[in-house]
């Protein structure tokens, strides 16, 4: 393991950073491939940003090149699978104390091998202080960037790219953190940066912002006066004192002046009438804790009132707070929130950011990378490699680390394609993908965390089995187990660590951890086999459907969709059956389905709609490979095509569980077209279009879809959206409101969830919705 020692005057010192307990080669990951650097040096903390390329394995599928063979007769799979190396881009952000600046620069210099850059962008007050040291150690020219410009660019970046970035802090609520959904238009807003002093900036667009005010009374005031009053020199220790203090012992309250008469003034007796008002007349010593608390209230109330006045003056209702004074400290966030609520009478929101400590570093990086146009891409937080928002409770997490900021590590992956809202969302600004917020529902949270823990052995076993020729598969799988288990324990004690905790985020985190240890598609061979078997049955299924009368066929098609959706390897109730009974197939799945009336049953309403004029274009979000896509979805697609309806079939861009991927759907469609003239003609005439969603998870976020898909939806005038599967239609989007008609259908394959919804295992949800006029 590489070591990194603090150095002072050339001699060794303590370990890298008390706040980072990971070994240096895990902190400075992919440093050897770093292409561009930026650094934000504050009064006590340094934030380093660098862009690197990451090489990892991806599973690729390719159709066999012998079309003359009869796919139904031969016993070979429908396509071949290969694992290839792929290079992607990643942003790394690291926070460490300035004490260890020289040691970290030495480590970076010793491990830089492939960098082409000759410049490092620098911002923050320390950019001047450490300029010569950085240039000497890294042999890179320091380009100093404007602090405020960097902060604004960084703030815009995280608000656009990271879901649940902003939150309100409500101390007496459960949960304390209320995360905001991503708003499609983040402008305008007020940014209040509380460093040594206070800067207040109105941000109107990506490039237009204006410094509109500020104050000399800020974090430096709290630190300086606090040190004089308490003899405590460390900022974090001062805040700890404040958290234990009672300000009413030092402050003069309204009730101290007016007694019971304060009610006639319409004021609360507990309001502060005079900060430190009792200290002039009291004949006793005050505790350090009480003085620190009084000082914190005085400064926070002043900043809150100032921010509120500027927000009102400029007609703004969103105020984001950042700077070293905040840094995720609950006592600070609580006092600022109270102040904003009081002075604005609840009309202005005080919002904080999960990554506010990195805004300057992100902005400096973006300034240096303008020629690469990083804003043309979408970026996603990598949960496997990032630290979480720190606990406000006593430290319970297995990974012990002292508080020195909101984050220790942050990594963001560049996504292949830009992501946008589905144009058919009724109101993108109020859209919430997830049905249940597990940070808000303690019972559901404990159940799902336990559920994912108990499933871990099976995931590890499947990962190892997917790479039988790899000599280190078992070792990597064990590392995956340890990392994901650690994430689950963190989330047990800090459910807000990565924003709103949901089933979707638990699944995403698991996929990120699998990819981290080069298990890109553990179910690739399962999907290959099931696709091959289902293709052999396709013609018999369509012949059976064609023999039915119209009304009988519509119900059979829906039951086929539902039966296909049973085949979900992510559901333990199903995977147990599939592993114990290899003969379990399409007909057996139909018999598992709940009899009508279903748990949610809009089928009669749907049938009545089918008797009317046909839709123009249907957008279908498919779920699983094998029987689901081939015997459930494609016959349904075929029926829509026969009605003259165009179809856009959207599948995941990358693998997760046994969900069908876009590349697999292309091969499946090609094989089906060779057997079915309706599908063949529709593909040739572009009436059936296969597209990728732009994402990989088993759930579906309609606010982050491939831009090409959104363009196609507009061009084709889609007026029906079909979402199938538990992940896409129950865990997410169950309450999603669209501008057009929608079908949400799934089989509930989890007994606990089914009971909670008022049903039983294999209950059916068939939800047909028409938008209100």
From Swiss-Prot:
GO terms for molecular function: ATP binding; metal ion binding; pantothenate kinase activity; phosphatase activity. InterPro entries: ARMT-1-like_metal-bd_sf, ARMT1-like_metal-bd, At2g17340_3_helix_bundle, ATPase_NBD, PanK_long, Type_II_PanK. Keywords: Acetylation, ATP-binding, Coenzyme A biosynthesis, Cytoplasm, Hydrolase, Manganese, Metal-binding, Nickel, Nitration, Nucleotide-binding, Phosphoprotein. Homodimer. Interacts with PKM. Its main location: cytoplasm. Phosphatase which shows a preference for 4'-phosphopantetheine and its oxidatively damaged forms (sulfonate or S-sulfonate), providing strong indirect evidence that the phosphatase activity pre-empts damage in the coenzyme A (CoA) pathway. Hydrolyzing excess 4'-phosphopantetheine could constitute a directed overflow mechanism to prevent its oxidation to the S-sulfonate, sulfonate, or other forms. Hydrolyzing 4'-phosphopantetheine sulfonate or S-sulfonate would forestall their conversion to inactive forms of CoA and acyl carrier protein. Subfamily II proteins have an EGMGR motif about 50 residues from the C-terminus. This motif lies near the metal-binding residues in the putative substrate-binding cleft 2. Subfamily II proteins occur only in eukaryotes, in two forms: as a stand-alone unit in plants, and as a C-terminal domain of pantothenate kinases in plants, animals, and chytrid fungi. Mn(2+) binds at residues 623-624, 659. The gene is Pank4. This is 4'-phosphopantetheine phosphatase. GO terms for biological process: coenzyme A biosynthetic process. Residues 403-773 are annotated as: 4'-phosphopantetheine phosphatase. It comes from Rattus norvegicus (Rat). Residues 2-402 are annotated as: Pantothenate kinase. A motif (Subfamily II EGMGR motif) lies at residues 724-728. The modification N-acetylalanine is found at residue 2. The modification 3'-nitrotyrosine is found at residue 320. The keyword Protein biosynthesis does not apply. Its cofactor is Mn(2+); Ni(2+). Activity is strongly promoted by Co(2+), Ni(2+), Mg(2+) and Mn(2+). Activity is inhibited by EDTA. Acetyl-CoA binds at residues 196, 199.
């Amino acid at each position: 393991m590489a070591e990194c020692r603090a150095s002072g005057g050339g001699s060794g010192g303590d370990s890298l950073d008390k706040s980072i307990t990971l070994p240096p080669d895990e902190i400075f990951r992919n440093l050897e491939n770093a292409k561009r650097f930026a650094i934000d040096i504050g009064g006590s903390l340094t934030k380093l940003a660098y862009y690197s390329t990451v090489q990892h394995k991806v599973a690729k599928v390719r159709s066999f090149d012998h079309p003359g063979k009869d796919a139904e007769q031969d016993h070979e799979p429908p396509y071949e699978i290969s694992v290839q190396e792929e290079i992607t881009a990643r942003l790394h952000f690291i926070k460490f104390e300035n004490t260890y600046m020289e040691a970290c620069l030495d480590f970076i210099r010793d491990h830089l091998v492939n960098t082409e850059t000759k410049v490092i962008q620098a911002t923050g007050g320390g950019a001047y202080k450490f300029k010569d040291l950085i240039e000497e150690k890294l042999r890179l020219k320091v380009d100093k960037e404007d602090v405020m410009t960097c902060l604004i660019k960084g703030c815009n970046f995280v608000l656009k790219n990271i879901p649940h970035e902003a939150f309100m802090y409500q101390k007496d609520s459960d949960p304390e953190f209320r995360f905001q959904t991503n708003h499609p238009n983040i402008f305008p807003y007020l940014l209040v940066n509380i460093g040594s002093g206070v800067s207040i900036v109105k941000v109107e667009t990506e490039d237009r912002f204006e410094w509109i005010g500020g104050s000399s009374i800020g974090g430096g005031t709290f630190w300086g006066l606090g040190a004089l009053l308490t003899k405590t020199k460390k900022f974090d220790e001062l805040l700890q004192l404040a958290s234990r203090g009672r300000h009413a012992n030092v402050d003069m309250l309204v009730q101290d002046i007016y007694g019971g008469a304060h009610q006639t003034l319409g004021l609360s007796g507990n309001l502060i009438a005079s900060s430190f008002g009792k200290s002039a007349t009291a004949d006793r010593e005050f505790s350090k804790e009480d003085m620190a608390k009084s000082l914190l209230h005085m400064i926070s109330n002043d900043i809150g009132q100032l921010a509120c006045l500027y927000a009102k003056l400029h007609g703004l209702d969103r105020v984001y707070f950042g700077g070293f004074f905040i840094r995720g400290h609950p006592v600070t966030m609580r006092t600022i929130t109270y102040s904003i609520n009081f002075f604005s009478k609840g009309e202005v929101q005080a919002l904080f950011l999960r990554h506010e400590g990195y805004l300057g570093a992100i902005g400096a990086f973006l300034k240096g990378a303008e020629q690469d146009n990083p804003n043309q891409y979408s970026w996603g937080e990598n949960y496997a490699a990032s630290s979480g928002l720190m606990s406000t409770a006593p430290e319970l997490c297995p990974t012990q680390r002292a508080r020195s900021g909101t984050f220790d590590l942050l990594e963001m992956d560049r996504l292949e394609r830009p992501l946008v809202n589905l144009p058919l969302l009724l109101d993108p600004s109020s859209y919430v993908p997830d049905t249940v917020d597990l940070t808000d529902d303690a019972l559901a949270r404990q159940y799902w965390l336990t559920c994912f823990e108990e499933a871990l052995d099976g995931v590890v076993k499947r990962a190892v089995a997917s790479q039988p020729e790899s000599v280190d598969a078992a070792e990597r799988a064990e590392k995956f187990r340890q990392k994901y288990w650690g994430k689950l324990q963190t989330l047990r004690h800090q459910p807000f660590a990565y924003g709103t905790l949901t089933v979707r985020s638990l699944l995403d985190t698991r996929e990120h951890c699998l990819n981290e240890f080069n298990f890109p598609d553990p179910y690739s061979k399962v999907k290959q086999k099931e696709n091959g078997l289902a293709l052999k049955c396709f013609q018999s299924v369509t012949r059976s459907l064609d023999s039915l009368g119209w009304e009988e066929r519509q119900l059979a098609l829906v039951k086929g969709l539902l039966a296909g959706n049973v085949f979900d390897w992510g559901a333990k109730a199903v995977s147990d059956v599939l592993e114990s009974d290899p003969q379990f197939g399409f007909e057996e799945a139909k018999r598992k389905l709940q009899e009508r009336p279903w748990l949610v049953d809009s089928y009669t309403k749907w049938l009545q709609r089918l008797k009317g004029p046909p839709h123009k274009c249907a957008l279908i979000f498919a779920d699983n490979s094998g029987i689901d896509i081939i015997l459930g979805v494609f016959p349904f697609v075929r029926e829509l095509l026969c009605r003259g309806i165009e179809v856009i079939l959207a599948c995941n861009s990358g693998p997760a569980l046994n969900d069908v991927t876009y590349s697999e759907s292309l091969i499946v469609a090609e094989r089906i077209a060779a057997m079915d003239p309706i599908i063949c003609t529709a593909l040739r005439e572009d009436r059936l279009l296969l597209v990728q969603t732009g994402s990989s998870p088993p759930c579906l976020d309609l606010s982050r879809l491939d831009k090409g898909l959104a363009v196609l939806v507009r061009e084709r005038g889609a007026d029906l959206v079909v979402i199938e599967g538990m992940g896409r239609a129950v865990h997410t989007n169950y309450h999603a409101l669209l501008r057009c008609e929608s079908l949400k259908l799934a089989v509930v394959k989890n007994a606990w969830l089914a009971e909670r919804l008022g049903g039983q295992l294999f209950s059916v949800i068939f939800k047909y919705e028409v938008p209100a006029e």
